[in-house]
Amino acid sequence: MRRIKKLVMCSPGDDGYIDYGSSIVNIVKYTSRDKKVLRRAIKPKIGSGRFDVAAVQAARLITHEYTHYLDLTTTVWGLEFIVRRNLAYQAIDAGADIESKAVEVAMLNYAEILMHKGLVKVYGHVPIEDVVTKHSLSRNEKYGTIIMIHLMKGEGRIADVPVSMLSLLEANAVANELMGEALWIERVFGEVSSFHKNRISSNLDSIMKNVNALEYNAFHLLVVIHFPRLTIFDRLRLVGAVADFALNISGMHLSHVANTIFRSILNSTLRNALCNELCRGMSRQVVAFKVLLFIYQYTQENELSDEGVSEKLKSPLELICSALQYFGCDLQAVNVRSMSDFEYCFSVSMLRGLRRKFEPAGHVEAMLRNRRARKNTVFISEKFGFLSCLIFICSTISTSRCLIDKDSIFGRIMSPFMMFIAS
């Protein structure tokens, strides 16, 4: 059995991952012999009332990795990443060395993902339970201005976790993965019973307690610490909302948010450096982190009940804009969306202007259609039944089969999205 070699610029995970250098998802856990399980995962029998453990596990994995693909191809952050990446490829293809300007610019985006592994520190291999968080701002010679989350238990420190782009992307993928599982259950049973809610909540708890999964659980830990009484699905919705906002906010509005963040930081030297990075369109993970804390303070000082927060999460962008407005950043949801669309389309025009050898035929058009389909929800699972989709499961023996049809759990998501499995 042959496996595609995992490169440095990939998401973590042994069962599957996205290669950020090519935008291709690789599913390692399954081979072409597992197509029956994959079909049951993608196309559950509606109303069957049969819980299929293997199919649910496959659905979770595919949803997790597909979230990475959509975050890379349908967000303002993702398109900037791809444009810079392809400009670097074009420069190298033309004979430029690795110290060329295009490569250096692309490495700024890569560094935001790579920094997590270089900065995370674990002091005790114990379950993450009954912890509190402390936050610090520091300057790192290699990665610039960094916000660190310190996980404290009693007088001891369990771990230091950087607020990295990787931690934001993985938190969003986990949120979508678990919401996707809930959708699978709803399709099969007609509802998500208390038993399955508790089971999904237990799955999230196991992720949050794992000190070796800090790239996955950092943002989820922040949410459960600050909003302990929200339901499991409201907490997932909140993580998805702040991730979607941070990945899609336009450069102009990012500067407005940077000014608000600036006022919330006491260290004048470091806040200047951090806000300069934000004004250049970098450090979007910091936006998610600070917006989450702004929402917490906004709900506390306005004495919003858990039910009130839950109600506002039905329109998460409105909640985020209300929280920012409370701290002096006047953003209107409709303007946030329109400016985000404008900047995304500008990046698309740049991508079309590059040599097409770095993107497969039809990929740019697929990105645009997927973005339109994803526009009004923070969860990809909420649109699965309404998208137009072709996902190809390609074996390494050069055989392509269309595995997903219009009645699948994924609906019909626009191709080309390629998942490679071993033959």
Residue ranges and their predicted role:
Residues 36, 137-154:
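Active-site-adjacent bridging/hinge elements
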Residues 159-172, 208-214:
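Active-site metal-coordination segments of metallo-dependent hydrolases
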